[in-house]
Protein backbone atom coordinates (compact mmCIF):
# COMPACT_ATOMS: atom_id res chain seq x y z
CA UNK A 1 0.00 0.00 0.00
CA UNK A 2 1.45 3.35 -1.06
CA UNK A 3 -0.81 5.92 0.62
CA UNK A 4 -3.27 5.87 3.52
CA UNK A 5 -5.85 8.64 3.89
CA UNK A 6 -7.01 8.92 7.48
CA UNK A 7 -10.08 10.67 8.87
CA UNK A 8 -11.56 10.84 12.37
CA UNK A 9 -15.23 11.79 12.43
CA UNK A 10 -17.88 12.64 14.99
CA UNK A 11 -21.40 13.99 14.50
CA UNK A 12 -20.83 15.15 10.91
CA UNK A 13 -22.08 12.36 8.64
CA UNK A 14 -23.18 14.76 5.90
CA UNK A 15 -19.78 16.44 5.80
CA UNK A 16 -18.01 13.08 5.85
CA UNK A 17 -20.08 11.94 2.86
CA UNK A 18 -19.03 15.01 0.88
CA UNK A 19 -15.38 14.30 1.67
CA UNK A 20 -15.60 10.61 0.76
CA UNK A 21 -17.41 11.37 -2.50
CA UNK A 22 -14.73 13.93 -3.40
CA UNK A 23 -11.95 11.45 -2.65
CA UNK A 24 -13.35 8.41 -4.45
CA UNK A 25 -12.64 9.59 -7.98
CA UNK A 26 -9.08 10.62 -7.08
CA UNK A 27 -7.89 7.27 -5.73
CA UNK A 28 -6.51 4.02 -7.07
CA UNK A 29 -7.78 1.62 -4.43
CA UNK A 30 -5.21 -1.01 -5.38
CA UNK A 31 -2.48 1.21 -3.90
CA UNK A 32 -4.45 3.78 -1.87
CA UNK A 33 -6.61 3.16 1.18
CA UNK A 34 -9.04 5.28 3.17
CA UNK A 35 -9.47 4.66 6.89
CA UNK A 36 -12.20 6.37 8.92
CA UNK A 37 -12.62 6.26 12.70
CA UNK A 38 -16.16 6.91 13.95
CA UNK A 39 -15.75 8.43 17.39
CA UNK A 40 -18.89 7.39 19.24
CA UNK A 41 -21.49 8.57 16.72
CA UNK A 42 -24.44 6.31 15.90
CA UNK A 43 -25.76 8.47 13.09
CA UNK A 44 -22.49 8.10 11.19
CA UNK A 45 -22.58 4.30 11.38
CA UNK A 46 -25.19 4.19 8.58
CA UNK A 47 -22.42 5.16 6.15
CA UNK A 48 -20.46 1.95 6.77
CA UNK A 49 -22.60 -0.12 4.39
CA UNK A 50 -22.79 2.71 1.86
CA UNK A 51 -18.99 3.00 1.49
CA UNK A 52 -17.58 -0.56 1.49
CA UNK A 53 -14.26 0.63 -0.01
CA UNK A 54 -13.52 2.51 3.23
CA UNK A 55 -11.79 0.71 6.10
CA UNK A 56 -13.97 1.60 9.07
CA UNK A 57 -13.03 1.70 12.74
CA UNK A 58 -15.86 2.33 15.17
CA UNK A 59 -15.93 3.19 18.86
CA UNK A 60 -19.25 2.80 20.66
CA UNK A 61 -18.28 5.62 23.02
CA UNK A 62 -16.37 8.78 22.18
CA UNK A 63 -12.67 8.66 23.04
CA UNK A 64 -11.99 12.12 21.53
CA UNK A 65 -10.01 13.22 18.50
CA UNK A 66 -6.38 12.69 19.44
CA UNK A 67 -6.76 9.22 21.02
CA UNK A 68 -8.90 8.25 18.02
CA UNK A 69 -6.15 9.37 15.64
CA UNK A 70 -3.63 7.43 17.71
CA UNK A 71 -5.67 4.24 17.30
CA UNK A 72 -6.47 4.79 13.63
CA UNK A 73 -2.93 5.56 12.47
CA UNK A 74 -1.73 2.24 13.91
CA UNK A 75 -3.98 0.49 11.38
CA UNK A 76 -2.65 2.31 8.29
CA UNK A 77 -0.44 0.43 5.83
CA UNK A 78 0.65 3.16 3.41
CA UNK A 79 4.15 4.55 3.14
CA UNK A 80 2.60 8.01 3.36
CA UNK A 81 -0.22 9.00 5.71
CA UNK A 82 -2.50 11.83 4.58
CA UNK A 83 -4.64 13.27 7.35
CA UNK A 84 -7.88 15.11 6.62
CA UNK A 85 -10.68 16.47 8.76
CA UNK A 86 -14.10 15.00 7.99
CA UNK A 87 -15.16 18.42 6.65
CA UNK A 88 -12.10 19.03 4.47
CA UNK A 89 -11.16 17.82 1.01
CA UNK A 90 -8.21 18.36 -1.37
CA UNK A 91 -8.70 20.72 -4.28
CA UNK A 92 -5.85 19.20 -6.32
CA UNK A 93 -6.72 16.06 -8.26
CA UNK A 94 -3.04 15.08 -8.10
CA UNK A 95 -2.50 15.79 -4.39
CA UNK A 96 -1.12 12.28 -3.82
CA UNK A 97 1.39 12.54 -6.67
CA UNK A 98 2.58 15.93 -5.40
CA UNK A 99 3.03 14.55 -1.88
CA UNK A 100 5.02 11.57 -3.14
CA UNK A 101 7.20 13.81 -5.31
CA UNK A 102 8.01 16.24 -2.50
CA UNK A 103 8.88 13.47 -0.06
CA UNK A 104 11.13 11.85 -2.65
CA UNK A 105 12.93 15.11 -3.44
CA UNK A 106 13.23 16.24 0.20
CA UNK A 107 14.30 13.30 2.37
CA UNK A 108 14.63 15.44 5.52
CA UNK A 109 11.03 16.63 5.30
CA UNK A 110 8.87 14.48 7.56
CA UNK A 111 5.58 16.38 7.28
CA UNK A 112 3.90 18.40 4.53
CA UNK A 113 1.54 21.10 5.81
CA UNK A 114 -1.05 21.82 3.11
CA UNK A 115 -2.58 25.21 2.36
CA UNK A 116 -6.00 25.61 4.00
CA UNK A 117 -8.82 27.71 2.57
CA UNK A 118 -11.70 28.04 5.02
CA UNK A 119 -15.29 28.56 4.01
CA UNK A 120 -18.35 27.08 2.34
CA UNK A 121 -18.49 27.61 -1.43
CA UNK A 122 -20.77 26.64 -4.28
CA UNK A 123 -17.99 24.78 -6.09
CA UNK A 124 -14.30 23.97 -5.92
CA UNK A 125 -13.80 26.43 -8.76
CA UNK A 126 -15.07 29.20 -6.48
CA UNK A 127 -12.65 28.13 -3.75
CA UNK A 128 -9.71 28.22 -6.12
CA UNK A 129 -10.33 31.88 -6.93
CA UNK A 130 -8.89 32.57 -3.46
CA UNK A 131 -5.73 30.61 -4.09
CA UNK A 132 -2.54 32.55 -4.75
CA UNK A 133 -0.70 31.79 -7.99
CA UNK A 134 2.71 32.38 -6.39
CA UNK A 135 4.35 29.26 -4.98
CA UNK A 136 4.78 29.48 -1.21
CA UNK A 137 7.01 26.93 0.51
CA UNK A 138 8.96 27.26 3.74
CA UNK A 139 9.99 25.24 6.77
CA UNK A 140 7.61 25.83 9.66
CA UNK A 141 6.99 24.89 13.28
CA UNK A 142 3.85 22.77 12.96
CA UNK A 143 1.01 21.70 10.70
CA UNK A 144 -2.76 22.17 10.65
CA UNK A 145 -4.70 18.96 11.15
CA UNK A 146 -7.33 19.53 8.47
CA UNK A 147 -4.85 18.65 5.71
CA UNK A 148 -1.31 17.28 5.90
CA UNK A 149 0.92 14.36 4.92
CA UNK A 150 3.48 12.52 7.04
CA UNK A 151 5.88 9.72 6.20
CA UNK A 152 4.88 6.49 7.92
CA UNK A 153 8.45 5.77 9.02
CA UNK A 154 8.70 9.23 10.59
CA UNK A 155 5.35 8.89 12.36
CA UNK A 156 6.44 5.56 13.80
CA UNK A 157 9.60 6.92 15.45
CA UNK A 158 7.44 9.33 17.46
CA UNK A 159 4.80 8.53 20.07
CA UNK A 160 2.16 9.40 17.49
CA UNK A 161 -0.84 11.55 18.28
CA UNK A 162 -0.91 11.91 22.06
CA UNK A 163 -3.42 9.97 24.12
CA UNK A 164 -3.03 12.59 26.87
CA UNK A 165 -4.67 15.25 24.70
CA UNK A 166 -8.37 15.03 23.86
CA UNK A 167 -8.95 17.63 21.14
CA UNK A 168 -7.14 20.81 20.01
CA UNK A 169 -3.37 20.82 20.23
CA UNK A 170 -2.48 17.29 19.18
CA UNK A 171 -0.84 18.54 15.97
CA UNK A 172 1.58 20.70 17.98
CA UNK A 173 2.62 17.65 20.00
CA UNK A 174 3.32 15.49 16.96
CA UNK A 175 5.13 18.41 15.30
CA UNK A 176 7.38 18.81 18.33
CA UNK A 177 8.33 15.13 18.28
CA UNK A 178 9.00 15.08 14.53
CA UNK A 179 11.22 18.18 14.73
CA UNK A 180 13.03 16.77 17.77
CA UNK A 181 13.90 13.68 15.70
CA UNK A 182 15.70 15.92 13.19
CA UNK A 183 13.04 16.06 10.46
CA UNK A 184 11.49 19.19 8.96
CA UNK A 185 7.92 20.34 8.39
CA UNK A 186 7.35 21.98 5.00
CA UNK A 187 4.44 24.32 4.41
CA UNK A 188 3.43 24.18 0.75
CA UNK A 189 0.57 25.67 -1.22
CA UNK A 190 1.13 23.18 -4.02
CA UNK A 191 -1.60 21.22 -2.26
CA UNK A 192 -4.70 23.04 -1.06
CA UNK A 193 -7.62 21.78 1.02
CA UNK A 194 -11.00 23.42 1.41
CA UNK A 195 -11.91 23.30 5.09
CA UNK A 196 -15.67 23.63 4.86
CA UNK A 197 -16.38 25.52 8.06
CA UNK A 198 -18.79 28.36 8.73
CA UNK A 199 -16.90 30.61 11.13
CA UNK A 200 -19.86 32.79 12.03
CA UNK A 201 -22.02 29.78 12.83
CA UNK A 202 -19.33 28.24 15.02
CA UNK A 203 -19.03 31.46 16.98
CA UNK A 204 -22.80 31.62 17.43
CA UNK A 205 -22.80 28.08 18.85
CA UNK A 206 -20.18 29.22 21.38
CA UNK A 207 -17.56 26.80 20.25
CA UNK A 208 -15.03 29.49 21.20
CA UNK A 209 -15.64 28.80 24.91
CA UNK A 210 -15.20 25.10 24.40
CA UNK A 211 -12.03 25.58 22.38
CA UNK A 212 -10.66 28.06 24.92
CA UNK A 213 -10.91 25.55 27.75
CA UNK A 214 -9.45 22.70 25.75
CA UNK A 215 -6.56 24.77 24.44
CA UNK A 216 -5.69 26.14 27.88
CA UNK A 217 -5.60 22.63 29.32
CA UNK A 218 -3.75 21.02 26.44
CA UNK A 219 -1.18 23.81 26.09
CA UNK A 220 -0.38 23.34 29.77
CA UNK A 221 0.06 19.61 29.17
CA UNK A 222 2.26 20.39 26.14
CA UNK A 223 4.65 22.45 28.28
CA UNK A 224 4.64 19.86 31.07
CA UNK A 225 5.50 17.02 28.70
CA UNK A 226 8.06 18.64 26.38
CA UNK A 227 9.77 21.46 28.30
CA UNK A 228 12.60 20.68 30.75
CA UNK A 229 11.58 23.64 32.95
CA UNK A 230 7.93 24.40 32.12
CA UNK A 231 6.75 26.44 35.11
CA UNK A 232 7.61 29.89 33.71
CA UNK A 233 5.86 29.10 30.41
CA UNK A 234 2.79 27.84 32.27
CA UNK A 235 2.67 30.88 34.55
CA UNK A 236 2.75 33.19 31.51
CA UNK A 237 0.04 31.12 29.83
CA UNK A 238 -2.26 31.30 32.86
CA UNK A 239 -1.70 35.01 33.42
CA UNK A 240 -2.25 35.94 29.77
CA UNK A 241 -5.48 33.97 29.53
CA UNK A 242 -6.73 35.25 32.87
CA UNK A 243 -6.22 38.89 31.85
CA UNK A 244 -7.40 38.61 28.25
CA UNK A 245 -10.31 36.20 28.63
CA UNK A 246 -11.28 35.25 32.19
CA UNK A 247 -11.53 38.88 33.33
CA UNK A 248 -13.59 39.93 30.34
CA UNK A 249 -16.40 37.40 30.26
CA UNK A 250 -18.17 35.37 32.97
CA UNK A 251 -18.31 32.23 30.83
CA UNK A 252 -14.62 32.50 30.02
CA UNK A 253 -14.01 32.94 33.76
CA UNK A 254 -15.85 29.72 34.59
CA UNK A 255 -14.18 27.87 31.71
CA UNK A 256 -10.76 29.08 32.88
CA UNK A 257 -11.13 27.65 36.37
CA UNK A 258 -12.78 24.50 35.09
CA UNK A 259 -9.70 23.93 32.91
CA UNK A 260 -7.37 24.52 35.88
CA UNK A 261 -9.31 21.97 37.91
CA UNK A 262 -9.06 19.44 35.05
CA UNK A 263 -5.30 20.03 34.82
CA UNK A 264 -4.76 19.34 38.52
CA UNK A 265 -6.89 16.18 38.41
CA UNK A 266 -5.09 14.76 35.37
CA UNK A 267 -1.57 15.64 36.47
CA UNK A 268 -0.68 12.27 38.08
CA UNK A 269 -1.69 10.47 34.87
CA UNK A 270 0.36 12.88 32.73
CA UNK A 271 3.69 12.30 34.47
CA UNK A 272 4.49 8.98 32.70
CA UNK A 273 4.31 10.78 29.32
CA UNK A 274 6.87 13.42 30.23
CA UNK A 275 9.44 13.62 27.43
CA UNK A 276 11.54 16.81 27.76
CA UNK A 277 13.16 18.14 24.59
CA UNK A 278 16.65 19.60 24.84
CA UNK A 279 16.98 23.39 25.02
CA UNK A 280 18.89 23.70 21.73
CA UNK A 281 16.09 21.96 19.81
CA UNK A 282 13.43 24.05 21.56
CA UNK A 283 15.25 27.25 20.61
CA UNK A 284 15.56 26.12 17.00
CA UNK A 285 11.86 25.31 16.86
CA UNK A 286 10.95 28.67 18.39
CA UNK A 287 12.66 30.43 15.46
CA UNK A 288 10.50 28.69 12.86
CA UNK A 289 7.42 30.49 11.48
CA UNK A 290 3.92 29.10 11.83
CA UNK A 291 2.19 27.67 8.78
CA UNK A 292 -0.30 29.88 7.01
CA UNK A 293 -3.85 29.31 8.25
Task: Give the ranges of each region predicted by the language model.
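Acidic donor-binding segment of Leloir-type glycosyltransferases
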Residues: 20-58
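Glycine-rich, basic loop-to-helix element that forms the pyrophosphate-binding segment
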Residues: 59-76
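Short aromatic/hydrophobic "clamp" motif used to bind/position activated sugar donors
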Residues: 81
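Conserved donor NDP-sugar-binding/catalytic core segment of glycosyltransferases
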Residues: 89-124
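A recurrent flexible, glycine/aromatic-enriched loop bordering the glycosyltransferase active site
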Residues: 118-120, 133-150, 166-167, 172
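A short, conserved alpha-helix in the catalytic core of glycosyltransferases
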Residues: 148-150, 154-159, 164-192
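Catalytic core of nucleotide-sugar-dependent glycosyltransferases
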Residues: 193, 203-233, 254-268
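Non-catalytic, C-terminal membrane-associated alpha-helical segments of glycosyltransferases
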Residues: 229-293
